[in-house]
Amino acid sequence: EQPVVDNGAGLSRNASITASGLGQMLQNAWVSPVMPEFVSSMPIVGVDGTLRRSKSRFAGAAHLKTGSLRDSAALAGYVDGASGQRYVLVAMANHANAAAARTAWDALVDWTAAQ
């Protein structure tokens, strides 16, 4: 399924992408010539951006971007596992209480980083 881009900022209810589609895009970006700049533009968990106050035990082990609109929230990017494996992580919630998913997502990031 192709993503639908409305205004380029991601702040439109007319824009859409599936979790699978976003994951594929992140995998493709990893092998792209612009990968270093792309990844460095993403906040580091526990260090900067909207995840600087994350309670993750693995601060510094992930480059993740958050996004939210009323009744929806998302988290996507790359997590470095303890084994040296790098993982693509995508989480999306579309619900009136979508922000409540953040606690579970913190646990998901920690679990992934521990792998």
Residue ranges of model-derived segments:
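Small-residue-rich helix-loop
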Residues: 1-115
